[in-house]
Amino acid sequence: STVELNTPINPKEPFTRYKYPTLNLLKKYEDNGAYIDEEEQIANKNRIIEVLGNFGVQIKTIRATVGPTITLYEIQPAEGVRISKIKNLEDDIALSLAALGIRIIAPIPGKGTIGIEVPNAKANIVSMESILNSKKFQETKMELPIALGKTITNEVFMVDLAKIPHLLVAGATGQGKSVGLNAIITSLLYKKHPNELKLVLIDPKKVEFSVYSRITNKFMAAVPDEE
C-alpha cells in the first residue's frame, strides 16, 4: 500500500498504525562483489614494492583488502625501517599508481603494519537501499541510527546520532556533503515514528532540502518566521 505523506500525524496515534517508508522507494544497484580484479591488485602491489625499494625501503609482506571504493594495501616493513620514511613517500606512491590520491595509515591501530589506501580504478556504488536493507540496520537497537556507508571490509558503518553531541559536515564542492546529510535524514525517516522525531531543516538556498517538503506535516517542527 502507498504511504500518504501529506496526512498529519495525531500525537496520540498508536505507533502500530503508522506505515513506514518501503525500501522500494530507494534505487537498487546490483552488487557483483568484484570491486577490483586480481591483475590490478598484483600490478599495484608491484608498483608499491618498486617505489619503496627505489628509496631503500624494504618490506616483508604486502596484502590487499578490497572494498567498494578503495583497496587497502597492508605492508609489513623490514626491521629497522622508520615509519616516517614511508609516510614521506606518499606522493611518490600516488604518482606510481596514477591515483588521484592515497592515504597512508602508519601504523594501523592494533597491528604492526602500515596501510596504504588506494582508490579503485572503478568504484562500486554503495546504495542507500543496500545499507537500510541490511540485517545490521534492520535489527539495530540504537536510539537514532544513521547509516553512513560501508567499511573497507564491506561492513555497514553506522553510528548513533543520540551519542554525538555535535556534528560538523565540511568539505570541498562535490565531496558528498549533501549526500551525507541525505543519508542521515533518510536513515532516521526509515527508523523513527513521527511522534519520535521532529526535524528543523534550514536551507537558505531552498534547494538541497526542498525534496523533504512532502513530509512537513509529519516530521517538520513549526518555525513561525521563514526568515
What spans do the regions from the language model cover?
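P-loop NTPase catalytic phosphate-binding loop
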Residues: 17-18, 108-113, 117, 136-227
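Low-complexity, intrinsically disordered P/S/T-rich segments
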Residues: 1-166
